[in-house]
């Protein structure tokens, strides 16, 4: 699914993300990393990034079922490519607990620190 910004914002709000991070910043970041597409899959050096949040297989999710228990989010990376973004959001909440928060996604600093009016719904 390719979401529109206000669709994405509404779903994020339904899952309490507005209490974690300002939604315009988050939606802007998501747009710049995945185009708000659940099917975005990117090879990034030796890692692969999945879904609307571009969650990395570098410890956050697992490529193989037998590695799921050792991943931070306890999920197969391929699950981030389906149309249900509930599990993506739950994993993103864990990423946002990192000291760098939204800074985990480089696009945030580059594109989403100011002039956020276009990302409001």
From Swiss-Prot:
Regarding tissue, the record states: Mammary gland specific. Secreted in milk.
Its Gene Ontology cellular component terms are: extracellular region
Record-annotated disulphide pairs: 6-121, 28-112, 61-77, 73-91
What are the GO MF terms of this UniProt record?
A: calcium ion binding; lactose synthase activity; lysozyme activity
In its keyword annotation, does this UniProt entry include ATP-binding?
A: no
- Subunit structure, per the record? Lactose synthase (LS) is a heterodimer of a catalytic component, beta1,4-galactosyltransferase (beta4Gal-T1) and a regulatory component, alpha-lactalbumin (LA).
Q: State the protein's purpose.
A: Regulatory subunit of lactose synthase, changes the substrate specificity of galactosyltransferase in the mammary gland making glucose a good acceptor substrate for this enzyme. This enables LS to synthesize lactose, the major carbohydrate component of milk. In other tissues, galactosyltransferase transfers galactose onto the N-acetylglucosamine of the oligosaccharide chains in glycoproteins.
Q: Name the Gene Ontology biological process terms.
A: defense response to Gram-negative bacterium; defense response to Gram-positive bacterium; lactose biosynthetic process
Looking up SUPFAM superfamilies in the UniProt record yields:
Lysozyme-like (SSF53955)
Pfam families this protein is in?
Answer: Lys (PF00062)
Residues in domain C-type lysozyme? 1-121
Where are glycans found on this sequence? 44
Record-listed Ca(2+) binding positions: 79, 82, 84, 87-88
According to its UniProt record, which protein family does this protein belong to? Answer: Belongs to the glycosyl hydrolase 22 family.
For this UniProt record, give its keywords in alphabetical order, as a comma-separated list.
Answer: Calcium, Disulfide bond, Glycoprotein, Lactose biosynthesis, Metal-binding, Milk protein, Secreted
- Predominant localisation class: secreted
In Swiss-Prot or TrEMBL terms, this protein is called Alpha-lactalbumin
Taxonomic source organism: Notamacropus rufogriseus (Red-necked wallaby)
